[in-house]
């Protein structure tokens, strides 16, 4: 940790931190006023974020206390820290507004800084099995999915654990509250780095698996910006083939599908009933009319909102293992580990241990906790 006298906030990091909290400049100014006792204006926050006035020493700490990040985090240079670098992919609904999307992008950027700091400190080994796969008029998204399954030696049939598969290939997966139900996952693979996927903790388990496969499709197929709808369709087709390979799922769909049969297939393949119906249509097992009829039936039963048959929720392991190493082998306190990620202890625990803690990880007394 740097001496407070050397602290100078990076203007872009101030904006990124505020966006990640979903606050306006006025809301941040109000919180700083509440904490400090003296009036902080929206204009002051605006000038600080624009770099027109330097934010030093005690004022850095005030911003940090209000935004609930460490002061060191706000002083990181965004052009060297990796924040905001790389193409961002997300599986979202059209109704997701710009402020919510800005918050998610900021959360992704700051999460990358956090996980990179933890992985580096723990000397976390990560495989490097991701690569770009070209998709064109001859090589389809389904071909790309088949290629990745072959290269990663995925056994035939349903995938047992998508999170484990992605982590073993070199990605880091973080399950956290993205403060919306309009987006299930977001991902990024910056140059020279490893893929990172944020999975919305609000997403149902069956939808989460498809979202992870969807993000994998983006990561391997879409290294450059493209037409949004085209890339979304390609990622969906990749995900369908990756999770439900045509040669394995087709014989199970061909006898015909109804709601009862869909429940059985959902439990076996670990995808939603809606995804199975779409797969059946795309493979020519049912007509578009039959597809629409089944979707109307799901709606009438209330299954478009919440489907029956619970699927096991898959949990990340690699970052929790890194935290265990930092605390048990390198003897860092929980607060010191949290500060490595630029967070307070409670928020760090909620993000990196509650949703992804392997059994056996326990909190230990921390005399340094504030």
Positions of the model-derived regions?
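Active-site hotspot residues in diverse enzymes, especially metal/ion-binding acidic/histidine motifs
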Residues: 1-370
């Amino acid at each position: 940790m740097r001496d407070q006298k050397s602290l100078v906030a990076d203007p872009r990091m101030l904006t990124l931190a505020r966006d990640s909290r979903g606050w306006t400049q006025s809301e941040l100014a109000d919180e700083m006023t509440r904490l400090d006792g003296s009036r902080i204006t929206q204009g002051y926050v605006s000038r600080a974020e624009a770099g027109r006035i330097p934010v030093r020493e005690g004022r850095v700490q005030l911003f940090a206390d209000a935004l609930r990040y460490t002061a060191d985090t706000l002083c990181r240079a965004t052009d060297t820290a990796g924040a905001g670098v790389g193409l961002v992919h997300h599986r979202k609904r059209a109704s997701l507004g710009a402020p919510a999307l800005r918050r998610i992008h900021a959360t992704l950027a700051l999460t990358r800084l956090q996980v990179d700091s933890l992985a580096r400190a723990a000397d976390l080994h990560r495989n490097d099995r991701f690569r770009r796969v070209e998709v064109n008029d001859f090589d389809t998204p389904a071909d790309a999915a088949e290629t990745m399954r072959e290269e990663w030696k995925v056994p035939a049939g349903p995938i047992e654990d998508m999170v484990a598969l992605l982590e073993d290939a070199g990605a880091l997966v973080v399950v956290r509250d993205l403060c919306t139900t309009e987006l299930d996952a977001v991902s990024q693979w910056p140059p020279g780095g490893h893929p990172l996927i944020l999975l919305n903790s609000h997403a149902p388990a069956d939808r989460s698996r498809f979202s992870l496969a969807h993000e994998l499709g983006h990561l391997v197929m879409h290294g450059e910006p493209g037409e949004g709808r085209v890339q979304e369709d390609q990622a969906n087709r990749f995900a369908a083939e990756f999770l439900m390979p045509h040669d394995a799922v087709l014989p199970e769909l061909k006898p015909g599908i109804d709601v009862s049969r869909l429940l059985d297939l959902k439990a076996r393949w670990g995808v939603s009933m809606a995804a199975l119906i779409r797969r059946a249509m795309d493979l020519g097992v049912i007509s578009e009319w039959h597809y629409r009829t089944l979707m109307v039936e799901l709606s009438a039963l209330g299954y478009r909102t919440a489907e029956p048959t619970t699927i096991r929720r898959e949990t990340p392991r690699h970052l929790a293992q890194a935290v265990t190493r930092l605390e048990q082998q390198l003897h860092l306190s929980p607060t010191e580990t949290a500060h490595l990620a630029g967070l307070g202890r409670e928020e760090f625990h909620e993000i990196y241990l509650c949703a992804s803690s392997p059994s056996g990880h326990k909190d230990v007394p921390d005399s340094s906790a504030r």
